[in-house]
A protein has these predicted regions:
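Short strand-turn motif at the edge of the Rossmann-like AdoMet-binding core
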Residues: 3, 7-8, 337-340
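Non-catalytic nucleic-acid substrate-recognition regions in nucleic-acid-modifying enzymes
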Residues: 6-7, 16-147
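Class I S-adenosyl-L-methionine
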Residues: 127-147, 174-176, 385-428
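Glycine-rich adenosyl-nucleotide cofactor-binding module
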Residues: 143, 154-204, 215-233
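Conserved S-adenosyl-L-methionine
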Residues: 190-203, 210, 214-262, 268-278, ...
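Glycine-biased, low-complexity coil/linker segments
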Residues: 208-211, 346-347, 352-356, 360-363, ...
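Intrinsic-disorder-associated, low-complexity terminal segments enriched in Asp/Asn/His/Tyr and depleted
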Residues: 266, 351-354, 380-382
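S-adenosylmethionine
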Residues: 271-342, 380-416
Length: 428
């Protein structure tokens, strides 16, 4: 079976997540934001709730080398027509590619064929050649009463498929903005990024079913985003620690809110006050399967003395990694965020001359790095024996759309942000 995945705003990060989750299959990057997975395993619709980097996914049913509407129509009619209809059938068409495919003729002819079969229909259209996940969700195109037909141009062919599920944007927004305890001043990790980090730390996590026994630690738990997302992904043994009493209170409140909102049962979690640089005093050696965390990233407001901040954070992270190595199991992973300061934080070039820069790997291509700001002020903590893992499969590492740093990490952020996130995967 072949599945397609429409990737999020950071395709490299999204692809790395898919490679970790679906390590039993063969991944191909069809376009900058389209991945194709060939696998023997059936992928259920609810997987979309556990992979943060995918906007929509579906099953590829056929392929054709023809650009003619009639040839495409003949194929999509075999897998897109409903078996039984109770109300007016809704359908939409999304085309990912640069070829000239007449979507208007295709949509009108498909609507005509449905009517000839006694099926009244409504064609859902958009100004763009692709339908957003919001449009797909609002028009119920992933239900039995609808369909989003997806056409992907790749390798001189058109791959024809149907969307199975789209990212649950309402739920993600609810968890991000509806939580009872938020600390906007110290920063908030987006739930989608938390899911990606969890999957990078524990390969194939959503595919293993509920009730997994791995022990997950977040030693800078903040308001508990990583822990609550791990709960929703089926993990049952969670540990959170922080040096801030308020952070622990916020985490406890948010965990309780998630448990009540989603009616979760049998989740074991422990919260305790601890400095991350002394956490081995609280946990046994080799007792933790994965450490996933966004540590303190430095002050986010006011005039920043970047050189001083970098020095302080490097000391904090180096000492923390030394402790993590004591409590983490052999081959266990640490997935953490390191801050990357953009050049917009400083004035003249002379002000920035002493900042260590973070170079993006040249094989990422100009298209891959075009949206990146000028990055500088990156950290280089002592890894204390940990190894940085390249999360991209070897077969895709030279793809022109892959955007890694020179040290094989990924950078995440938006153009207006002064501090970006560097996602680092470490292995013991």
């Amino acid at each position: 079976m072949k599945y397609f995945f429409v990737l999020g705003i950071n395709p490299t990060l999204s692809l790395a997540e898919l490679a970790a989750v679906f390590n039993h299959g063969e991944l191909t990057l069809a376009q900058k934001n389209i991945a194709i997975l060939e696998t023997d395993q059936k992928i259920e619709a609810n997987i979309i709730k556990k992979i943060g980097g995918t906007i929509k996914f579906g099953l590829i049913h056929d392929k054709t080398a023809s650009l003619m509407a009639q040839d495409i129509l003949k194929s999509i009619a075999t897998f897109s027509k409903p078996e039984k209809i109770e109300t007016k059938f809704k359908f939409g068409i999304s085309f990912y590619g640069k070829a000239k495919v007449n979507l208007k003729i295709l949509g009108m002819e498909f609507k005509k064929r449905l009517l000839q079969s006694g099926i009244p229909s409504r064609w859902v259209v958009s100004r763009e050649p692709t339908l957003s996940s919001v449009v797909v969700e609002q028009n119920k195109l992933t239900t039995a009463q609808g369909a989003e037909i997806v056409i992907i141009q790749f390798d001189k062919k058109l791959f024809l498929g149907k969307t199975i599920a789209v990212q649950p944007f309402k739920e993600l927004s609810f968890r991000d903005y509806g939580r009872p305890a938020r600390d906007d001043y110290s920063g908030m990790l987006p739930p989608k990024l938390a899911q990606i980090m969890i999957n990078l730390a524990l390969a194939s996590s959503p595919c293993q079913g509920e009730g997994r026994g791995e022990v997950i630690l977040d030693p800078f738990c903040g308001s508990g985003t990583i822990l609550t997302e791990a709960m929703l992904m089926g993990y049952k043994n969670l540990i959170g620690a922080d040096i801030s009493d308020r952070a622990l209170q916020d985490t406890k409140a948010n965990i309780g809110w998630i448990e009540k909102s989603y009616e979760l049962r049998d989740v074991s979690y422990e919260l305790f006050h601890s400095d991350a640089t002394k956490i081995s005093k609280c946990l046994a050696a080799n007792s933790v399967d994965a450490i996933i965390t966004e540590p303190y990233l430095g002050p986010q407001r006011g005039k920043l003395e970047i050189e001083k901040i970098i020095k302080e954070l490097e000391e904090l992270y180096s000492r923390s990694l030394m402790e993590f190595k004591k409590i983490l199991k052999t081959n266990g992973r640490v997935v953490m965020v390191w801050p990357v300061f953009t050049l917009s934080l400083r004035g003249s070039a002379s002000d920035r001359s002493n900042l260590p820069s973070l170079s993006l790997r040249a094989t990422g291509g100009s298209e891959a790095i075009s949206r990146m700001p000028s990055l500088a002020g990156s950290l280089n903590p002592n890894l204390n024996g940990f190894t940085i893992i390249n999360p991209i499969p070897a077969s895709l590492q030279k793809n022109i759309f892959i955007n890694l740093t020179a040290r094989r990490t990924m950078v995440y952020g938006r153009e207006q942000q002064k501090v970006w996130r560097e996602i680092v995967v470490l292995e013991k």
